[in-house]
């Protein structure tokens, strides 16, 4: 889990709100893809529920990642951006695919769209 990603999650908290991050640590001492974020440490989900994709906390993580990806390409939608109409449309399509990511059935197996080149 990179620092920017963790920052996006933490920035979504209200002041004074508690949170915990659960997950396995890999050989590089980094969290794996199955990190569970919860704002209420007492509501730790069971591992079976996590593996079944029934973790609303995981959707918080996905939305945080999506927010970061959308913010990183906000510039492509500015009126005076030096992009062709075709490129701007490609970016609009990419951004819509990001917005639609919550339609995926499993928050642990997200297929992220590839940004335009």
Predicted segments — roles?
Residues 1-117:
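A preference for well-ordered globular domain cores
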């Amino acid at each position: 889990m990179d620092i920017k990603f963790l920052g996006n999650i933490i920035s979504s908290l209200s002041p004074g709100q508690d949170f915990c991050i659960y997950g396995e640590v890999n050989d590089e001492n980094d969290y794996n893809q199955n990190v569970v974020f919860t704002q209420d440490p007492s509501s730790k989900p069971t591992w079976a529920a996590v593996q079944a994709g029934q973790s609303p906390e995981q959707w918080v993580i996905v939305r945080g990642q999506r927010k970061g990806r959308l913010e990183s390409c906000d510039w492509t939608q500015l009126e005076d951006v030096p992009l062709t109409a075709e490129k701007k449309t490609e970016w609009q399509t990419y951004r819509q695919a990001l917005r639609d990511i919550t339609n995926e059935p499993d928050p642990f197996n997200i297929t992220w769209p590839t940004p335009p080149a």
